[in-house]
Amino acid sequence: IQYKVKYQDNTPFDDFYLKAFPSMKGYFWYFPLENGYAHIGAGDYERKNNNVFVDEFLKKHKCEVIKKVGRPVRISPPKNSEPFTDGRKTVGVGESIGTVYPLLGEGIIPSTWCAQLFIKHITDFNAYRREVLKKFQIYALVFKFIQMKINGKFNLFKNAVELLKIYNHMKHEEKRYGMEVKFKDLMKVSRI
């Protein structure tokens, strides 16, 4: 669920704000826009906590709700979304084939990367497929991590290499994700 809201006086935050749910199966977000507008919302795997967090935030930070928008976010990676084409006229690009970073639910920038790959390989769908799978390979690993956490099958010792790969990816991409990535924080997520 997501709301577009308008604050008359002060906005709650000058920058974006994310808060993971205690279950680590979803999170609340606040994204400021311009002139007192913002997007606030929440989403979780089980769809249990969305309204609780949003309602608490709306009560604490008074604003006018402009509109309500809600839809599921697909976090299944491209590897799990094949085939990308029907072989005739239709080719999947972006979020339709899973270019959403599963740990954060962010898909706008990855979808533009995917669109660039599509344009680059518009006459060779096999090359497009190969390059998409390579570019978004880490998404499959992150998705597997999330599935193991949800199903209670993650083991820190057995899955340490995978966790380190996820950390290295996020650490290398700190600027892109707009956050400082600390290994201790990823360890907290892995223990929950």
Task: Describe every region a protein language model picked out.
Residues 18-36, 79-104, 138-152:
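A broadly tuned preference for mixed-charge, low-complexity surface segments
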Residues 9-18, 37-39, 54, 74-81, ...:
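Low-complexity, flexible helical/coil segments
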Residues 1-51:
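Conserved FAD-binding catalytic core of PHBH/FMO-like flavoproteins
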Residues 19-23, 47, 65, 74-78, ...:
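A general structural signal for short secondary-structure boundary/capping elements
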